From Swiss-Prot:
It comes from the Bacteria. This is Cell division topological specificity factor. Keywords: Cell cycle, Cell division. Prevents the cell division inhibition by proteins MinC and MinD at internal division sites while permitting inhibition at polar sites. This ensures cell division at the proper site by restricting the formation of a division septum at the midpoint of the long axis of the cell. GO terms for biological process: cell division; regulation of division septum assembly. The keyword Chloroplast does not apply. InterPro entries: MinE, MinE_sf. Belongs to the MinE family. Pfam families: MinE.
C-alpha cells in the first residue's frame, strides 16, 4: 500500500462499485422480485451522482422505474438532459 493511499484512503474502484450493484440486482432477481424494489432509491441516487459528474442535470429529471412485463422485470431509466446552445 502506498503512502498516499494510507494517508488519504483508497477510493473504491469503478469495477468494484459496478460489481456490488450487479450483485444487488442478481440477488433481487433470485429472490423472485418479492416485495418492493428496495434498491431503487439508492440506484437513483448513484445515477444522479455519476451523471452529475459529466452533465449539469436536475436530480428531478432522472427517473428510475421497475416494471414487470409478462415474466420479465424491466428496469427503466429516463434522464432529461439539458439542451446545449440555448
Amino acid at each position: 500500500m502506498s503512502l498516499l493511499a494510507r494517508l488519504f484512503g483508497e477510493k473504491k474502484k469503478t469495477a468494484e462499485i459496478a460489481k456490488n450493484r450487479l450483485s444487488l440486482l442478481i440477488a433481487h432477481e433470485r429472490s423472485g422480485g418479492a416485495g418492493t424494489a428496495d434498491f431503487l432509491p439508492a440506484l437513483q441516487k448513484d445515477l444522479i451522482d455519476v451523471i452529475s459528474k459529466y452533465v449539469n442535470v436536475n436530480p428531478d429529471d432522472i427517473k428510475v422505474q421497475l416494471d414487470k412485463q409478462d415474466n420479465v422485470e424491466v428496469l427503466e431509466v429516463n434522464i432529461v438532459l439539458p439542451e446545449h446552445g440555448r
